[in-house]
Amino acid sequence: MKPGDLAKKSKLTMLELRYLPFWLVPLTATSTYEGMLERISPAIIRKGTIQNEYDWLVLGRKAAEFPTREYRVPTEGKILFDFTKIEGQAKFLSSELDSDEAVIRAKDEVEENQRFLLKQEVDQVTQFDTSFTVEKPTYVHAPLWFVRYEYKGKSYSAIIDGSTGSMIRADIPQTDFKLI
């Protein structure tokens, strides 16, 4: 819960519009597994398949961090690229990944996600294999506002979707709870 005086007592220290490059990689992941379910007694050997379709978002920068799992590229605001419509003060970042590198990164991240989902089925994995069907990746730039503000002497940050105005991620100061 945010403090009640956050809007009044916070001070904006940075507001920057950046167009970040993303690769949207549509793919289907099919994972076959074998493992032990040990939550019940006696332990049971389980075999199965986990299949999911993804529109996996990959940030087109190598060293940058961005909460891609929390962000959904808004499809309704998608327009053909026109450099003349970029705001003058905005930072426009190009991709450091080509489409093949984006697909490799998407496959790695999706396989990790499939392994995470597998933990709901078995406790101990003895065999795991994933195959992919990948469609053509789409290269997009998304307008994002990066915000930094101060509240009671501490610095906080936020990221806002420039297309929809929705909050993607924000650091919120802790509220002081007092017992009466």
PLM-predicted stretches and their roles:
Residues 160-162:
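A charge-rich, low-complexity, intrinsically flexible signal that marks solvent-exposed coils, linkers
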Residues 155, 166-167:
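Hydrophobic "anchor" residues
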Residues 164-166, 175:
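Short, surface-exposed beta-strand-loop junctions and turns on beta-sheet-rich folds
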Residues 1-155, 172-180:
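Charged, low-complexity helical/coil segments in non-catalytic cytosolic or luminal regions
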